């Protein structure tokens, strides 16, 4: 099967299918987007990231989260390899849970211009307290089915 060359809006060539070094920070990470061939159809796309990591900006200790990103694509789709690299750029980035979660949602909303987007950040306990952070762009398109994010509230051994 012949390779198909897909050009993205953000760069002449996608990162997909090429060796790429991990970005140093979320600010320098590139998100590739491709035209949505179903832009006139309301549907939901979900990315589940069960092993997201970042650093506490105060202690430098690692923080861990389970992210669920739901979006109703508009004119653009996010290319998943570039999303993976963008999310990996947080591994050495110091920010509070709320900032990481909301920054990811806002960056995706800015780049993709979706009809609707939400992100749930389910952070594992630090200091004995789990933090769940939720952000969305506005009202859900009428008639769009959105399943529950499927992440139970944190329960220790109790």
UniProtKB/Swiss-Prot annotation:
It catalyses: 7-aminomethyl-7-carbaguanine + 2 NADP(+) = 7-cyano-7-deazaguanine + 2 NADPH + 3 H(+). GO terms for biological process: queuosine biosynthetic process; tRNA modification. Residues 1-37 are annotated as: Disordered. Keywords: Cytoplasm, NADP, Oxidoreductase, Queuosine biosynthesis. SUPFAM superfamilies: Tetrahydrobiopterin biosynthesis enzymes-like (SSF55620). It comes from the Bacteria. Residues 27-37 have a biased composition (Basic and acidic residues). It holds the Pfam family QueF. GO terms for molecular function: preQ1 synthase activity. InterPro entries: GTP-CH-I_C/QueF, NADPH_dep_7-cyano-7-deazaG_red, QueF, QueF_type1. Pathway: tRNA modification; tRNA-queuosine biosynthesis. NCBIfam families: QueF-II. Belongs to the GTP cyclohydrolase I family. QueF type 1 subfamily. This is NADPH-dependent 7-cyano-7-deazaguanine reductase. PANTHER family: NADPH-DEPENDENT 7-CYANO-7-DEAZAGUANINE REDUCTASE. It is an enzyme of class 1 (oxidoreductase). Substrate binds at residues 78-80, 97-98. The active site is at residues 56, 63. The keyword Oxidoreductase applies. Catalyzes the NADPH-dependent reduction of 7-cyano-7-deazaguanine (preQ0) to 7-aminomethyl-7-deazaguanine (preQ1). Coiled coil: none annotated. Its main location: cytoplasm. GO terms for cellular component: cytoplasm. It is found in: Cytoplasm. The keyword Cytoplasm applies. The gene is queF.
């Amino acid at each position: 099967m012949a390779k198909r060359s897909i050009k993205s809006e953000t760069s002449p060539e996608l990162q997909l299918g090429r060796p790429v070094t991990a970005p140093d920070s979320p600010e320098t990470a590139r998100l590739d987007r491709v035209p949505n061939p179903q832009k006139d159809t309301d549907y939901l796309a979900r990315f589940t990231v069960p092993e997201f990591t970042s650093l506490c900006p105060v202690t430098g200790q690692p923080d861990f989260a389970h992210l669920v990103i739901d979006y109703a694509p508009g004119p653009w789709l996010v290319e998943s390899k570039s999303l993976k690299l963008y999310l990996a750029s947080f591994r050495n980035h110091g920010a509070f849970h709320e900032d990481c979660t909301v920054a990811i949602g806002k960056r995706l909303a800015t780049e993709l211009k979706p009809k609707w987007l939400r992100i749930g950040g389910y952070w594992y306990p630090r200091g004995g307290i789990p933090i769940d952070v939720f952000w969305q762009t506005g009202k859900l398109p009428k008639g769009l089915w959105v399943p529950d994010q499927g992440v139970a509230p944190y329960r220790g051994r109790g």
